[in-house]
């Protein structure tokens, strides 16, 4: 699904509210047929594993003190779905899925270009194979040639793993590339 609109019309706020990075002020949010607008903390943890986000600016969304490997492994560790020995294997698998060279595993975000940083952000978002991913302007900060690579990666992951995206953008050409449903928003 694509959400398109001018700057300031609330596209990113909608995405952040859906995944509980921001509190809602009105209305309800349903996920898997259940109102998740005001859920208890324990239930929110389970929901958060099923809903992730890929941010517009991969540099500011990645912990500068963590290596590529640590960033991608973090959700695996927090979830307690994997044993310690499995986390390393799963991290390597995810890095390969998103096209991050194994030699970059010990690199820090500032050592990577924008496209590689965004691949790390995507790797972190898909680590637990969530049902729903908000992609908040994930290619707007990238060069045009890199944009196509990242969009193709997102499409490939969507086809292979049945991921559902809410693609937030102001660029119709980007959303046409990735989305079959389109919602527009007008700031006025």
Q: Could you describe each region identified by the protein language model?
A:
Residues 19:
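Helix-to-loop junction immediately C-terminal to a conserved catalytic motif
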Residues 9, 183-188:
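Conserved small/polar residues in nucleotide/adenosyl-binding loops
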Residues 35, 85-103:
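Conserved ABC ATPase "signature" region
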Residues 36-52, 78, 84:
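ABC ATPase NBD coupling module
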Residues 27-35:
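Conserved ABC transporter NBD signature motif
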Residues 108-112, 116:
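Conserved ABC ATPase signature
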Residues 127-131:
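A short, proline-enriched helix->beta-strand linker immediately N-terminal to the Walker B motif
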């Amino acid at each position: 699904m694509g959400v398109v609109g001018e700057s300031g019309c609330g596209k990113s706020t909608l995405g952040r509210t859906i995944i509980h990075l921001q509190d809602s002020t009105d209305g309800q949010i349903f996920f898997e047929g259940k109102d998740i607008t005001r859920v208890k903390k324990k239930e929110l943890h389970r929901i958060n594993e099923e809903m992730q986000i890929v941010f517009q600016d991969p540099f500011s969304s990645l912990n500068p003190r963590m290596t590529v490997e640590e960033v991608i492994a973090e959700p695996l560790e927090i979830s307690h779905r994997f044993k310690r020995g499995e986390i390393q294997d799963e991290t390597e698998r995810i890095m390969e899925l998103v096209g991050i060279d194994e030699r970059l595993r010990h690199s820090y975000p500032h050592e990577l270009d924008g496209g590689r940083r965004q691949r790390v952000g995507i790797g972190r978002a898909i680590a637990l194979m969530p049902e729903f991913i908000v992609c908040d302007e994930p290619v707007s900060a990238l060069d045009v040639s890199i944009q196509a690579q990242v969009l193709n990666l997102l499409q490939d992951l969507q086809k292979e793993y049945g991921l559902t995206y809410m693609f937030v953008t102001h660029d119709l050409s980007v959303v046409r590339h990735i989305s079959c449903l389109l919602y527009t928003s007008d700031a006025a």
